[in-house]
Amino acid sequence: TPAVSESVKETVLDALRCCKRKGIEVVCDLNYRAKMWDKNTAQCVMRELMPYVTLCIANDEDFEASLGIHAFDGDMSRGIEQIDTYREGMQEITRQFPNCKAVASVLRSMYTVEDGDWMAIYLIGDQFYETPVHHVHSLEAVGAGDAFAAALIHMLKKKENPQYTIDFSIAASVLKLMIQHDFNIVTEEDIIRVMKSNDVNLQR
């Protein structure tokens, strides 16, 4: 993460320039962390990096904290109800950074620490793709964002269609909520089962 230090930020920027020269697509998960930097610094740095990004992942407060773009009011109990402002925020990212051809976002309505509804939306060009809502009682809320990003990249490499891609990605994310510790130790078949059944209770 470029939040670690100025030298790390410069290294990231050099890598992004290299990617652009070689035509390599770049995925960025904004994933703001208040313990690592303040919002002003984050926005200055991320605005310098975003012109090299082709796919951006932005969730909850990431829009405003990392880019100064409003999409979410901070109320985690009604995240899914705010889908229209999420859409507007995603479109604003592509307007401000025209190199960014796609934006993905996870929406959550959390009723307790463990219980909540999860879904995702995916913008490519001017077309939105939405997933079903998954109701989840989390075993451990760690790594769901990483699981989402990893699944999204996996589907992009497989060149799956956008709807399948985002459905697979949110299924991987909610499945991770049922697994302890950092790693999403599941198979592609496990994730597909969740996609088809909307049931995150893992059976192997």
Each language-model region and where it sits:
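Ribokinase/PfkB-type carbohydrate-kinase core domain
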Residues: 1-128, 134-135, 187-193, 202-204
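Conserved post-catalytic alpha-helical subdomain immediately downstream of the catalytic base
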Residues: 129-198, 202
